[in-house]
Amino acid sequence: MKSVIVGTAGHIDHGKTLLVKALTGIDADRLEEEKRRGITIDIGFAHLDLPAPNGEMLRLGFVDVPGHERFVRNMLAGIGGIDMVVLVIAADEGIKPQTREHFDICRLLSVRRGMTVLTKSDAVSPEMLEVVRLEVAEFVRGSFLDLSQIDPGKTDSARAPIVAASSLTGQGLDEVKAALGKIASEVPAKNAAALPRLPVDRVFTMKGFGTVVTGTLVAGTIRKEDELELFPSGKRVRVRGVQVHGSAAEKAVAGQRTALNLTGVSMEELARGMTLATVNTFRSTSRVDARLSLLASAKALKDGARVHFHAYTMETIAEVRLYGAKQIRPGEDAFAQLRLAEPGLLLPGDRFIVRQFSPVVTIGGGMVLDSAPPARKRRIEDTVAFLKVVMDSSPVESLAARVARRGAAGLALDQIPGEMNLRRDEVEQLVRGSTLVRCGTVLVSPRAFADASGRVIETVTKFHAANPLVAGMSKEELRDQVRLGAEVFSGILSKAVEEKKLEVSGELVRLPGRGVVMKDEEAESKKVIEQVFRAAGLKVPALKEVLAGLKVDRVRAQKIMTLLLRDKVLIKVSEELVFHQNALAELRQKLLALKATTPKIDVARFKELTGVSRKYAIPLLEYLDRERVTRRVGDERVIL
């Protein structure tokens, strides 16, 4: 059965709750004070099953909202997730202040379907009823409640779905139900496969059940035993039971009035304005970039002004920071960042309402475009260009823009579902249809990838020019200089090697075919150093004396030493001792030959075998331990 959420709207005492009761048989006023005072204070709920014109059964969930100006904030908490609205206007009073404000709110929230009901029609004459009907038709002309906007060919009498009814006598109620069924049948079904999200509008406890929350499920499906995340706290909860329109169910799907029995959280930890959603996906935010519209009846809104911010059941104070403007004039739109006093779960496409800080009246609303704006300031022109793209483009183009604005840092795949409100399989599909570069689990724009690749190659080229005696640049040093993340850096290196723009040897990166380039005196000095150490055997020469006798300066001599050590021609045993590789190889052979007759050796025997002093013997034995030629056992070494 298709579920459609219907919201009421209208001035106080125009008969919204009585109309809902007459249609459904359910009194949506649940509070004792509401019944005593005869007015709706908080949002109430009812439901009705109706046949659509094609015979399909529809379940209408009514959200009845208060009409008093003092309770508009409660009205906003209920109307955020509706599919269609019933604008209620009393025939004996006509259009009143909250009629206008509620109607403005519906338009700002981009409600696209609904009807108008003239209640208390039995209290006026037929002539007066016709006058009110004409007044209302003019009031809604050009809006979503004017059917001429859908079918300009309709006659004047059929342009606006305005039905006169009396909740007391029952007159017109059948026409109201017929119109509701027709309009509800045209409401597109919400996406039950999307990521689930339930804005909480009521919290209470039930004896024998525990903590219960209710709300309109705006997307996805929630089942018994599901684990959900509570925003903005991030606390994990489990669904012990599900009710849909007051009846137990195995699951709730998008578009249904839903009650959840929760475990893992107390009633004190829950409140209206919080949101339950899928785990490990979303993040709460205190800043959103949006397209903000100001009502024609509002005063100009200045940059930096504070407003009351309402989205679904959430309410907080926000500071408006306009992009490239000092104010928004009445009836105009602008891009803005809304800085919220309290964090909440907001996603691209969410509609919101702003009300003047004081006096508190509705002045505008808009749509969230980006709920994860960068912490670092960007040029206003760049931000506006980005917001225009995500507002008007396809999901693939929106993803490309979100990746591009992060430059070479890229965007991690696991961040995209929360930032764009997409399932992971939908993200994978978008990536396949894009030109984005994938570096492990990070996406980078082709331009940023090319620019970063150019920086890497340029950095290696400059390193070679400054260090002709060094065979290559270490990966760690290179990544540090170009300031790239590990996965993007690895992706760039792999691509550069594939295209033969770089070579990688172990931990060294170099230009293709680039070896050590030596001048004649440098090559001669290298040969001298190697010969001196080879001739010395285990009796290491004084390094200072060796370097002092060369034809090159000390800096180049040290680079030559580094090259010999890197190529393992010379081997550093300790900070002070360097040996030729041949000397150490001969020492290994001596120890292996000794093993047949003497499997163990102490320091004294080692000194006798090698002819070196204790100063050299200890570091050499420790080196042999590290190389697993010997193993120390007490004061002796076992030859392995």
Residue ranges, per PLM feature:
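Conserved G1/Walker A P-loop phosphate-binding module
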Residues: 1-65
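Residue-level recognition of beta-strand microenvironments
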Residues: 11, 203, 220, 242, ...
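Residue-level signature of catalytic and energy-coupling elements of molecular machines
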Residues: 13, 19, 38, 62-64, ...
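Conserved Switch II/interswitch segment of TRAFAC-class P-loop GTPases
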Residues: 58-60, 65-70, 79-131, 546
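Conserved nucleotide-binding/hydrolysis micro-motifs of P-loop NTPases
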Residues: 68-69, 92-96, 120-125, 167-171, ...
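Conserved catalytic-core segments of large NTP-driven translation/proteostasis enzymes
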Residues: 121, 138-299
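C-terminal effector modules of nucleic-acid-centric enzymes and ribosome-associated factors
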Residues: 124-128, 138, 265-572, 580-631, ...
